[in-house]
Amino acid sequence: MDQNVLYRGQRLTLTRFWATGEPCLWITDPEQIGMPKMEFVGGHPDEYCIFLKNLTEAERAQITSLDGTPLDMKEERNDIE
């Protein structure tokens, strides 16, 4: 599922959290750790992500491909509902 996406103007990686398999948006730049709903999730200083379950439907709708095309988040929604 690893895919580069845009969310709030930032390039993040749509992936699954290694410990639980939950879908999340993983940082690609250390400066992204200050984004709303970003959580420290690991032992290494660069392990931060936003879990999709913590985003509202409207916030999830803001996740797009790198060219701005909205993503079909159906599979990820099924994992978090």
PLM regions with names:
Residues 1-2, 73-81:
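Short intrinsically disordered terminal tails
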Residues 12-14, 71:
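Short, isolated positions in well-ordered beta-strands
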Residues 2-3, 25:
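Residue-level detector of beta-strand structural context in well-folded domains
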Residues 5-6, 17:
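Well-ordered beta-strand positions
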Residues 15-63:
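Acidic, low-complexity, intrinsically disordered interaction modules
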